[in-house]
Every structure is written in structure tokens, then in C-alpha cells.
Amino acid sequence: IKDENGTLVWDIQHLVNEVIRGVARCKEIGKIPSTVAIDTWGVDYVLLDKNKKEILPVVSYRDSRTDKVQDEVAQIISQQELYAKTGIQKQNFNTIYQLYCDRKSGKLDNAEYFLMIPDYLSFKLTDVIKNEYTNATTTGMVNAETKLWDKDIIERLDLPKHLFNELNTPCSLIGNFTKEIQDYVGFDSTVIFAPSHDTASAVAACPIDDNSVYISSGTWSLIGVESLKPIVNTESQKANFSNEGGIDYRFRFLKNYMGMWLFQNIRKNLDKKYTYDEMMHLAQSSTCVKYFDVNDESLVAPDNMLTAVNNLIGDLPLADTLSCVYHSLARSYKNAVDEIEKSADKTIDNIFIVGGGSKDSYLNKLTAQY
């Protein structure tokens, strides 16, 4: 992400280049894949014009532009109605609000194609334009019952209907590498759809049952259960839970919390003076426990994460601040499990933790304790 004239945007060409470099590396190490599939974070997208050229910039979900349109969208379609249709958690950065910003600015006027980030990266490998289901559900515009784009939402927000095409399920074929890609990487391969929302892929690999929850622990912590049907009720809306699409049309009933983002940015603010293990040991050396809302808006994209956290809990020594971050995360997980039991009418006995954050033994320990 980079700041471009006050707007947080993705260096999309860099992302494309890194994907292609990663594919080329397969040939270098002698492990040529028969298929390639891409997953990424949700909600962000790329618009293409009729010539399949990018309409830039590709704005990041961490940009604050959507804060100004929440009330406008709610006047057109209430959050209660949106949730009843889509089952998606209210978050200021949801695609629905980003697209509404683009409509107001005129950015959609010349848009012919709408691709979520993994769809776009697959397009750059194959020159085939297709949309995938699981990531599309993070837009807040896919009907949870029909599993199709909700035409009523699209019409009421006056979004161009031609942007929203067929939604393909995971494992569907996209196409083979273009000749240009083949020449660069040194081989051909078939590109297919993964569950292209990264959490959908992570959950697909989780051995969860009816009495288990998963925590996909990465930049975000996503906590939830799998369900054959969307769970849309007063309790789930009040607790702000999402019903995101999963493999085989299973639903990921979950809630998003800030996760390793807090530690990543604190470490960056300290000029990477400490490793993550050293930060963990500092936290363990402290007995200080203060709680804060890990989803506080001030933590989404602060200039300085350490300062932002201390604004919530008071100015504390580093070890104490880190301890409070750990305990606040673990308590948020506990609260989410309590809400799942209430909303989904389940008793939770096991927690499966996947993702990079699963390497944090102290956070795992606190999660078990809470």
C-alpha cells in the first residue's frame, strides 16, 4: 500500500510482478505445477475499461474514503435490510461502499469489467475474465439465499449492472497461461479458481466439526464456524457477524478482528528493532493487563500504531503495551466464541488456529486460557 496524493492505494503492478516472479520460481526449483490458483484478502477490486486496461488507482480498503458515504447508502438501503439480504458484517470498507464512492466520483463511467483482486491476478496470467463466488460474497452484494449478485441492491445503488457477471465456484477452470506468460516463466499451466478469499481457503483445510470454531490468524483474525445455511437473526446482526461464502456453498459464519496487523505496525514503528519473538517475550515479562477494542477505528490505518494503542490504554512502557495487545486480542476471541454459541445455538469445545499467527505460542496460550 502506498499513499498517493492522500489516498491509500495498491501498487497493483508490483503485485502482478510478484505473482509472475513466484510462478517463474517454480521452474527454477524444478517444481512445475499442473494447476495454479490464487487467493487474496477480500473486498478490494480492479476496474477495467472496454479495452481491458486498468482504471487506476486501485484504492485500498484501508483508505478512509468510504467513511463519508455510510449514511448515504443507509438512506437508500438500511443496514438491517442489507444484512437480511446478504448476511454480511457491517464494515466501513466493504466493497459496496467502495463502489458507491466510485459511482459518485465518475470512476465507474468507463468501467466494463469488475474483478476482485484474485480474479484480476488470474486474468493477468490468462487474459480470461471471470469472477469467483467466495470472494464476491465479501462485497456485501451477493444474496445469501440465491448465492447470486443481488440485483435489487445493485439497482438501488445505481451501479452498472453489466459489471456483475456469473459467479464461478472454487475448482472451476479459468484458462491456461498466455503465450507471453509462458515465454517468461518457461512453462504452461492451467489456472483454476481456489476459494479465492484467503480465509475460505484456510477454512477449507480446517478439520472442524459442529462443536469447533476456527481462528484464521493473520493480518486479520477471523473467528467462526461453518454452516450449511446462512445464520441471519437479531443476535447475529447485533454481534455483527458475517456469512461469507465457502467451499461447496458452505457458509463461513464469522467475525473479523484486527490481528497481527497490530504487531506488524508496532514493530514497524520501532524500526523493526525487535523480532516478533522478542516482542512476545517482552509481553510475557509484563503483568499489566488493560483491555481495548481491537477493532477501534483509530487502529485501521494509523500514522503510528504504538501511539494509537497508547491513546486507548494510556502511555505505558513497551512491554506493558504489548501485554495489553495480547490480552485484548485473546479476550476478543473469547467474546466472539460466546457470541457464536448464542447466535448459532452451539456449544464450542475446540478451537483450530490456522494462518501465520498460529506460530505465536503466547497468543495461542492466552486464547486457550480465556
Roles of regions detected by a PLM:
Residues 1, 163, 355-356, 367-370:
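Short, intrinsically disordered, charge-balanced linker/junction segments flanking boundaries
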Residues 1-57, 67, 84, 110, ...:
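N-terminal glycine/serine-rich phosphate-binding loop of ATP-dependent small-molecule kinases
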Residues 4, 28-61, 86-93, 118, ...:
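Short beta-strand-loop/turn "lid" adjacent to the catalytic site in phosphate-handling enzymes
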Residues 11, 63, 198:
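Short, conserved phosphate/pyrophosphate- and ester-handling motifs at nucleotide-, phospho-/glycolipid
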Residues 31-32, 163, 330, 347:
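Short loop/turn motifs at secondary-structure junctions
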Residues 67, 74-87, 92-116, 122-130, ...:
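Active-site core segments that coordinate phosphate-bearing ligands/cofactors
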Residues 151-172:
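A conserved helix-loop-beta module that forms one wall/lid of the active-site cleft
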